[in-house]
Amino acid sequence: VLLLVLFFPGDREYQRIPYDVVFLGDSVYGLCRDETSIAAKLQEKTGLKCYNGGLGGTVLGRADAERRLGYTKDSISAAGLVRSFVVKDFGVQRTVHIREAATDYFEDTLGDLGQIDFDQVKILFIGSGLNDYHSGTPIESTSDPYDEYTYCGAIRSIVKELREAYPELRIIFITPPYTWYT
């Protein structure tokens, strides 16, 4: 008896797509996906090939400190997405089941992000922070400056990982301005 065993990798081999500029962010970017989006306007004005990878409702840092790295929705935070760019594996993002309103574009966006040839990306815009603020994400940890479950720790971790993997990449953070909430 001859047994033939086929191994299927968890992630299909995709044709990598080159982009000059990638945008990550929350609903400010994610909910506007047409020719009026910031990514589309930048592409129109500069001729750079831009991709809008914004996902509404997401955060910069990881969200569930109780579960730590076992919470799959954390993989769509900016920190989680950057980790996937660096290791070139979007397998965990494909396991996330989002059932909230206005997320019908998530599956396509996450699939597209997994195909981007990040070695070709020149500029990464990360626009995030309001959801971190409103969800009560701590500003930073005194014991771990790279704690991705804090806002500043996530920024430090993102910059460190990207600098090590893509030293020529320009990283631009667009964070919310100071606002007084009552």
Predicted feature descriptions by range:
Residues 20, 49, 168-171:
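Residues at the starts of beta-strands that form the adenosine-phosphate
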Residues 28-141, 145:
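Conserved SGNH/GDSL esterase-like catalytic core that processes O-acyl groups on lipids
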Residues 38, 112, 151-158, 162:
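A general structural detector for well-ordered alpha-helical segments in enzyme core domains, enriched
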Residues 103, 145-156:
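Non-membrane alpha-helical structural segments and their capping/turn regions in soluble enzymes
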Residues 1-18, 22:
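Gram-positive cell-envelope targeting signals
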Residues 14-16, 118-119, 164-166:
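Short, conserved loop/helix-junction motifs that constitute active-site signature segments
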Residues 24-25, 174:
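Short hydrophobic segments within beta-strands
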Residues 125-137, 159-182:
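Active-site segments of SGNH/GDSL-like serine hydrolases
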